[in-house]
């Protein structure tokens, strides 16, 4: 694994399945059934493969632990391997559900400045916004 530096992280910085990323992709709350939610994704840093997503109440710092555990288990089932580390934007606390769930599988969790994850976040946000735009046009 290459040592990360303050620059924007890129897929070329990683090997497949050594590092996963978890982050919120919506820039504004999503209104579903009169409730505002945030959408979090789990992604492989090298391949950019999206393992899946979970929802959280808008304004909370992370999804519920059960959702995160299911998401991580589903990703593990697809790769039959745990990553070495999980990157989260910012400085996640020990109460963060991603920190707790990853720790159960001895996956190291590392907080990084959100700006270093911008390559991934922007790409996923653009795809998400394109999808929403095409879905709204079909309705």
For each feature predicted by the language model, list its residue ranges.
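Secondary-structure boundary/capping micro-motif
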Residues: 1-139
